[in-house]
């Protein structure tokens, strides 16, 4: 009898051990299943947010094209594309974003314009109009004159196609090769204003001050739409006038702008204290329409976000062409 009881006790221990192992295995399987379900849910939400962002991009494109059709000769802040803080609810989330006119700012690539024959880069008074205007913008942002000249010429050397210094104030490969880590100048147009951070003299603080006033277009032309410069960007208008008008005058004119913008630039220039004819190069820069636009879009699904940055250009017959799309990823 004692032997039978011992065998029964051993059998019970074995059964309990097997049950314990089965519970542990079941618990692990349950944990893994929950983890896989969460992963699947996150992947599904990420893909859904991405396609929502793509849908928002398509909506922006349609809105821009419709605005072009409604008024092909004028682009202004009263049009549908310029709506601020728009929120569109969608299943399980929402869409937000904004569209920026990339001709309401200074095109950094316009600084790549070469000097005329016989003109020295060190002769500050004989530089191309975009160079003078950018230096004036830096002055409005309280950058010292010498630093402004250095920074302007460093950007010129970054965006031009050669490796020769534009002036004694510039910076080419020799300067950047001495940095840690070393790198070379692009010697081509900037693709984005983010490239400014790689240029000599552009600190994080200076970049933050410059960012609202500058852009990088695939062109060396400087064209600024006076209908989309905001009053808080009045320093840009002062710079385009090469400091021949005051900041208060520029703000006053921009604040009094008609809701649907000026139909022609003369309606604006006639209000400025300095006649247009006294500033060589300015007339060719001012415009009342735009061709380049940037959309920054955010799609939210649950706790997941997808970011998308798209740049469009207006082509022939007011059709919109995608120039660049940057996927900010899901987060």
Curated annotation (Swiss-Prot):
TM ranges: 8-27
GO biological process: protein secretion
Top-level taxon: Bacteria
Ranges facing Periplasmic side: 28-331
Propeptide: 1-9
Compartmental location: Cell inner membrane
Protein modification: Cleaved by prepilin peptidase.
Keywords: Cell inner membrane, Cell membrane, Membrane, Protein transport, Transmembrane, Transmembrane helix, Transport
UniProt keyword Transmembrane helix, yes or no: yes
Main location class: membrane
GO cellular component: plasma membrane
Pfam families in the record: T2SSK (PF03934), T2SSK_1st (PF21687)
Keyword Transport in annotation: yes
Reported function: Component of the type II secretion system required for the energy-dependent secretion of extracellular factors such as proteases and toxins from the periplasm. Plays a role in pseudopilus assembly and seems to control its length. Interacts with the pseudopilus tip complex that is critical for the recognition and binding of secretion substrates.
Similarity comment: Belongs to the GSP K family.
Subunit and partners: Type II secretion is composed of four main components: the outer membrane complex, the inner membrane complex, the cytoplasmic secretion ATPase and the periplasm-spanning pseudopilus. Interacts with core component ExeG.
NCBIfam families: T2SS_GspK
Protein name: Type II secretion system protein K
Gene: exeK
């Amino acid at each position: 009898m004692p032997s039978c009881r011992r065998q029964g006790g051993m059998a019970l221990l074995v059964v309990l051990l097997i049950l314990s192992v089965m519970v542990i295995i079941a618990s692990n399987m349950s944990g893994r299943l929950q983890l896989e379900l969460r992963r699947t849910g996150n992947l599904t939400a990420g893909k859904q947010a991405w396609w929502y962002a793509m849908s928002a991009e398509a909506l922006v494109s349609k809105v821009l094209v419709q605005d072009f059709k409604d008024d092909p000769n004028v682009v202004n802040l009263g049009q549908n594309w310029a709506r601020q803080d728009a929120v569109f609810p969608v299943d399980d989330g929402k869409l937000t974003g904004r569209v920026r006119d990339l001709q309401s700012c200074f095109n950094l690539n316009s600084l790549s314009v070469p000097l005329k024959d016989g003109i020295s880069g060190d002769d500050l008074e004989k530089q191309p109009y975009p160079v003078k205007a950018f230096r004036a913008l830096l002055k409005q942002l309280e950058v010292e004159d010498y630093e402004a000249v250095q920074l302007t010429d460093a950007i010129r050397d970054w965006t031009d196609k050669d490796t020769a210094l534009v002036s004694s104030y510039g910076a080419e490969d020799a300067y950047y090769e001495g940095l840690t880590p070393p790198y070379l100048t692009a010697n081509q147009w900037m693709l984005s204003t983010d490239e400014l951070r790689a240029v000599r003299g552009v600190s994080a603080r200076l970049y933050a001050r410059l960012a609202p006033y500058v852009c990088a277009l695939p062109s060396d032309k400087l064209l600024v739409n006076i209908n989309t410069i905001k009053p808080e960007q009045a320093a840009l208008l002062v710079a385009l006038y090469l400091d021949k008008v005051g900041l208060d005058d520029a703000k006053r004119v921009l604040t009094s702008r008609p809701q649907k913008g000026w139909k022609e630039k003369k309606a604006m220039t006639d209000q400025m204290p300095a006649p247009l004819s006294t500033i060589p190069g300015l007339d060719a820069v001012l415009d009342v329409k735009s061709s380049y636009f940037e959309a920054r879009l955010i799609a939210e699904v649950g706790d997941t976000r997808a970011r998308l940055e798209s740049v469009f250009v207006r082509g022939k017959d007011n059709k919109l062409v995608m120039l660049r799309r940057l996927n900010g990823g899901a987060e």
